[in-house]
Amino acid sequence: MKQLHLEPIACIDGEINIPGSKSISNRALLLATLAKGTTTLTNLLDSDDIRYMLASLEQLGVQFELSDDKTRCTVQGMGGAVSASTAQTLFLGNAGTAMRPLCAALTLGQGEFTLTGEPRMEERPIGDLVDALRQLGASVTYLKNDGFPPLTINATGLNGGDVDIAGDLSSQFLTALLMVAPLAKGKVNINIKGELVSKPYIDITLALMAQFGVDVQNHDYARFEINPGQQYLSPGKVLVEGDASSASYFLAAGAIAGGSVKVTGVGRLSIQGDVKFADALEKMGADIEWGDDFIIARSAKLSGIDMDMNHIPDAAMTIATAALFAEGETCLRNIYNWRIKETDRLHAMATELRKVGAVVEEGHDFIRITPPVKMNTAAIDTYNDHRMAMCFSLLAFADCGITINDPDCTSKTFPSYFAEFARLTQEA
C-alpha cells in the first residue's frame, strides 16, 4: 500500500483556484445531455466520478468534445430522453453522483440498462429512489440485494403522479427525481417524508434546472410540483464553480496555520451550501474575509463549537480534524448521512481521531471530540474515501507530522490535492 508521510509544517500561505464542483459537474453533464442544443461546460472537474459519468454518456451515444486538460466539455444535447436499441451495462465505480441521477434519467426513454459499480457501491442504498421511480411507473429490478445496486431498468418512460420520498437519508435521491420529473408524461408532485437532509444540495439542483429553463415549484422543501410539457434548453455556456467542499481543507489550514490562504472559484455568490463551512470556521474564531468569488482564511486562536451540521455534511468532516487544533470540546450533530457515504464516515472519523490521541464519542448521528494535550503521530487509514485523506492532511500542522495511507484515493474529487497542499506549504 502506498503511504504519504507529511513532515510537520509550521505555516501555510498563498492562493489556490479550486477545481470544479463534483456535484455541479455531474448534474450539469446530465442536464446538458437531456437539453435541446449544445452546451459548453467550463471548469469541469477532472476526477474519477466525472470520468464514470462521461464514459457512461459516451456508451449511451451522447456526443461530446472534451478538452485535453479535461476541464472544458461541449455536449450535443439529445433534446429529451436517452434511449438504447440494445441492452447496455454501465459501470459507475463508487460514484453516487453518477449512479443516482443516471438511475432516474434512464427510466425516461426506451431500452434495457444495467447499472453496476465497485463493491462499496453495492452497500450504498438506492431503495428510496427506486421506490419513488416505481411510483411513477418505472420498472427497476435489483440483481443482488433489495434496495442496493446493481440493478436493471426496463425503460418505457415515466408517468406523472404523486410520489413520496424519504428526505432523511440522502439529498441525491431527491436531486435525481427532480431532474427527471419535467420529462415525465404528466405532472409530478413530490412529497418529502421526514426532515430533508443537505437542503443546500437541492438548491444547487434547482438553480441548475432553472439555468436550463425548467421551472419547479418548491413549497418550503416539503413538497415540489413539476409541470409536464417542459423541455431543458441549453443556456449555451455553464461555468462550473469551484468545489466548496474541496475549498474547506485549505480554509481550515489557513485558520490553523496561516499566513493567509485565499481560495478562488467560490465565494459569497456561490450556489453551493458548503461555502457556509467558512461560517463554522469563523464561529471557531478564525479570521474570514468574503468576496463574490473568493474566501480568505487567516489564523487565530480557535475554540471548540457545538453545531448542527446537517446543512454541510461533507465539509463538516473538515471541522472534525480542525477541532484537534481548537481549545475545548467540539460536537458535530445531525450527521447521520456520513454513515452512507463512500465509507461509514462517522465510524472512520472516530477511529482515526483516536489514533492521534483525541477522546471521541461516536453517537448514532453525532461526534464529540476532545483534542489531546499532545498529538501522537499515526498512520491514518483512508477507507478509499477521498475526504478522509484530505481531512487528515491537516495533521501536518501538529508538531509530530502524519502519515496518510492510500493518498491517491483523492482522485475521486481532487487528484492534485497533495501537490497543491505541498505548493502552499512550501511557499510558506
UniProtKB/Swiss-Prot annotation:
* Annotated Gene Ontology cellular component terms: cytoplasm
Name the residues that bind phosphoenolpyruvate: 22, 96, 124, 172, 345, 387, 412
Q: Which residues form the active site?
A: 314 (proton acceptor)
Asked if the keyword Ribosomal protein belongs to this entry, the reply reads no
Which reaction(s) does the protein catalyse, per the Swiss-Prot or TrEMBL entry?
3-phosphoshikimate + phosphoenolpyruvate = 5-O-(1-carboxyvinyl)-3-phosphoshikimate + phosphate
Listed binding positions for 3-phosphoshikimate are 22-23, 27, 170-172, 198, 314, 337, 341
Task: Report the family membership.
Answer: Belongs to the EPSP synthase family.
Coiled-coil residue spans: none
Question: What HAMAP family does the annotation carry?
Answer: EPSP_synth
GO biological processes: amino acid biosynthetic process; aromatic amino acid family biosynthetic process; chorismate biosynthetic process
Q: Name one Pfam family in it.
A: EPSP_synthase
Tell me, in one coarse class, where this protein mainly resides.
Answer: cytoplasm
Gene Ontology MF terms in the entry: 3-phosphoshikimate 1-carboxyvinyltransferase activity
Q: How does it assemble?
A: Monomer.
Q: Does the keyword Disulfide bond apply?
A: no
For this protein, the record's PANTHER family field holds:
AROM/DEHYDROQUINATE SYNTHASE, PENTAFUNCTIONAL AROM POLYPEPTIDE
Highest classification ranks of the organism: Bacteria, Pseudomonadati, Pseudomonadota, Gammaproteobacteria, Alteromonadales
User: Where does the UniProt annotation locate this protein?
Assistant: Cytoplasm
What this chain does, per the entry, is described as: Catalyzes the transfer of the enolpyruvyl moiety of phosphoenolpyruvate (PEP) to the 5-hydroxyl of shikimate-3-phosphate (S3P) to produce enolpyruvyl shikimate-3-phosphate and inorganic phosphate.
Q: Which UniProt keywords apply?
A: Amino-acid biosynthesis, Aromatic amino acid biosynthesis, Cytoplasm, Transferase
Q: Which InterPro entries match?
A: Enolpyruvate_Tfrase_dom (IPR001986), Enolpyruvate_Tfrase_sf (IPR036968), EPSP_synthase (IPR006264), EPSP_synthase_CS (IPR023193), RNA3'P_cycl/enolpyr_Trfase_a/b (IPR013792)
Pathway(s) annotated for this protein in UniProt: Metabolic intermediate biosynthesis; chorismate biosynthesis; chorismate from D-erythrose 4-phosphate and phosphoenolpyruvate: step 6/7
Q: Which organism is it from?
A: Shewanella denitrificans (strain OS217 / ATCC BAA-1090 / DSM 15013)
What EC number(s) would the UniProt record show?
Answer: 2.5.1.19
Q: What is this protein called?
A: 3-phosphoshikimate 1-carboxyvinyltransferase
